[in-house]
Structures are given as C-alpha cells and as structure tokens.
C-alpha cells in the first residue's frame, strides 16, 4: 500500500527523488554519512565531511540518525538516492503500522484501525512535507505509545487491567521512543514532553490509588521496566540535546528567536486547506492557499473524511464519554498550539509560552507540525465511531453486503484523499571535476542553491568539502563566501590555504548572476596555483 500511495517514488529510485532537490539530497547525505561514520569512525559522528573545517556539522540541522543502519547498504550517490527513496516509502508504511497498532490497542476493530492508520500516515497535510523525511518519519510516535499502552495493560475500551501487564512491551516502547528521537527533535521533542506529562499523570494516579486503597496500581516489574526504558530514553535525549546546544554555543547565529515562530505560524484557515500536491484537493484549494504566506507549513488539512468521522465519534463511539471528551480537548489544545502566534494573545499563553518555558521548544519554529498530534487524536476519535458501527452491524438488520460496503467506505475515502501528485525531479549528477579534485575542497558558486547537491555528491568517498546547506549561515561559511568572490587572487588563495582548502571546483553553468560570475576568465598567472578544465568544469589546485 505504501508503495502505491507514494508512487512513483520507486519507479526510478536511483535517479529521482520526491518533493524537490532542496532538503531531500541533504537528508540522503545524512543517512549516508551516519552509516559511513558508524563503521569507520563512530566517535567522530558529529564531525562530518561538510562545512569544513567546522566541528559538529552533522548536527547543524535536524537529523535522521536513526536511519544509520540503512546507510550501510551500498555506496556512492546512486545508492544514497535509492536509500532515501526506500526510507521515504517505509516511513509512510511505519506511520500506518504505528497508528494501526495504537488504535487496535485502544480497543478499535480492525477496519477502524486501518482507517485511522491510512488517515494518519497519508493525510493530505503530509504531502506538503514530501521534502522533509524527518517530518514524515512519525511512525515511532504512535508505535511507542501502542507498546507502552500494551505493556501497562491499558486501553480506552477496557481501562487498566493489571493482569495484562507486560514489562517487555514497556521496555520496547521506550526503546522505540528513543529511536524516534534520533529521527529528529522536530517530532521527537514534543513526544518527549508528552511522555513526561503522561508519566506525571500516572504518578499522581498511582499515588492517589495508594492513598485511597492502600494498594499499588503498578507492580515492581512494571516500575523497573519503566525505569530501565526511561533511563535509555532520557540518555538519548540528553545526548542529542547537549550536542545541539554545543552547535549553538559554537555558532550563535544558529539560535532561532521567536520571530521564526511568528513567521511560520498558520492561520486558522490553514487547517482547512490542502497542499498543492494533493491529487483530490490540490486544485480545489488553490485560491485558499494563495492567502497563506507560507503554504508548505500552513496547508494543514488532516483530511475531510477524518474530520467528519472524528466529529461523529464525539457522540457515537465505542469509547467512553470521558475518554471522548479528553480526546476532543486534546484536539482543541494541540490545534490551538499549532496556530502559534496566531492564537488569541499572539500565542501567549500558547505556543510562544512553551517556547519561553520549555527547554528546546524555541527551536521548534513551525507550530503547524503539531498536526502530527492533532491528526492522531482525530484518527482515534474516528476509529471509535467506526468501531461502534462495526460492532452494532448485526443489530441494524441491514443486508450483510450493504453494511460491509458502508463499513469499508471510510477506508476507501481516506485512501483517495491520500493520493499524491508529488513531483519527482531528477537529481543533478556530480561533474567529473568533483571526483578529480583533492580534498579538502570548495565548490563554487557557494550561494546556498546547489549546496545540497554538493553534500549528496560527497557521498562518493566522503571527501571533505567547505560547502553545506542549513537554515542558518555559519560564520566560517560566510567568511569563505565573502573572501572567494575575488578568487583567484593572492588574498583569497592565501586565506583558503590557511583554512586548509587544497582544491576549488568551479561549475561555470551555475555562475550566472552570482558573485563568482566570470570567474573562469580570471587569470592565474603568477599565483602559484594550477587549473584544469574537466568536462566543462574547472579544478583549481592550490598545493
């Protein structure tokens, strides 16, 4: 199913990539570098081959470190692209599996769980993030919650059943949660705070029960399983958190103030607007998208079918009324937080309050991504309604074929809403000059446009390059760009040698309109360097 609903991702998996050629090549490099570092020098994982000579460059942006084992498969650029495409499909598949498992554990029937899984994994809003593998990789969120609920013998339908305690599932749930952290804190940090809040509620409930009845709700093995799993989860969170803090310490320009959050905060309208890549709704919402200042982060439609079913699930459901009320409150709270600064009071109280109070939250500059949680809660509400209908089918007196069609209709509708028309551009190939240059090297132009391509090209042997692409401009990269606008001249050559750069690769077909326009025509006589033209590109050797 994931292959079909993400098609044509696996049609030409070695040469094309879903979304665009901005972030996907960068994340393909991330996976490749993680696998490379895992087997060659794991202690220097954070010090990648890009942004030379800086340190901690692997943590310059949100990472997908958890996919490192995939980075062991194959080598070179084509393998990196294939790997990315495969993970892209598997990320959708795992999101379905996670939501399906969670909703089943909560007490829904299989058909309802399938609807919830498809609606969550292939929601229209996610099509706007076809170029963000870290945002698409949400399966661990639902899966860890399913495992933890199962381990604690808890469901919405049957409540807490101590006889069904399974410590092994608890440990597994915490390990999956820890793995989810390694796929990026954009999704992982809200999960961490949700788990922390849930633990606090459970502790209060356990203490209250002990005070009232004199008994413990959780046995020793359950407590030990939570301690073991929680310690691993906490250790991973601290490891990642301190690394990112180190990046900010070394690069103060990496700090994001609340103006970023204000810029990416969606209006209420955004919750009812589909992205352009939605096959069913894309054209229909074109006019509405034009009203959004940044549609990729503001077109947040979770699905018309999902909304209708969730509303029905408020009054008609297999789940208890109090649970439905809590789910509805969760939808409202997460939806309100997702508005960012567009909530009443400019997001304070609200998302901006969390940015000021919760460690790390200020780095989450895109409030609309909380739709991960809003849509999951909507999916659970929807599953409650479908489950109630499914269990009451025999009492309705309808022909079996009719009731079966009615039961399967929501599944068909969410499948149709998940159909994409995502572009799959061809990835630019590395010029022979790139492979011929000695590292450390600099590729010009270095203006942010082609930096992701260069990072991807470097997966063939991982030569050290001064290039790289992130959402902030490191001071060292800014200085290199500024100094080399006059390259080749004595000053720029001396500077590059001092930094440690041995080669400069110039791509003439990309120079137009940049500060390096006309660079190949500049003379090199008397500068103590050599240059060679290779297949239309130039290699300048400084040593």
Language model features with spans:
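Hydrophobic alpha-helical membrane-interfacial segments at the cytosolic entry of transmembrane helices
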Residues: 1, 176, 214-242, 258-263, ...
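Membrane-interface coil-to-helix junctions
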Residues: 2-95, 123-138, 265, 269-288, ...
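Periplasmic/ER-lumenal interhelical loops and adjacent helix-loop junctions
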Residues: 21-37, 234-314, 359, 363, ...
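Membrane-embedded helix bundles of polyisoprenyl
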Residues: 88-106, 110-157, 161-206, 226-233, ...
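Membrane-helix boundary/interfacial segments in multi-pass membrane proteins
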Residues: 128-135, 256, 267, 286-298, ...
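Membrane-interface helix-loop-helix junctions at transmembrane boundaries of multi-pass membrane enzymes
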Residues: 208-225, 310-350, 393-401
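Signature aromatic-anchored transmembrane alpha helix within multi-pass, membrane-resident enzymes
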Residues: 226-234, 380, 384-417
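Extracytoplasmic
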Residues: 409-543
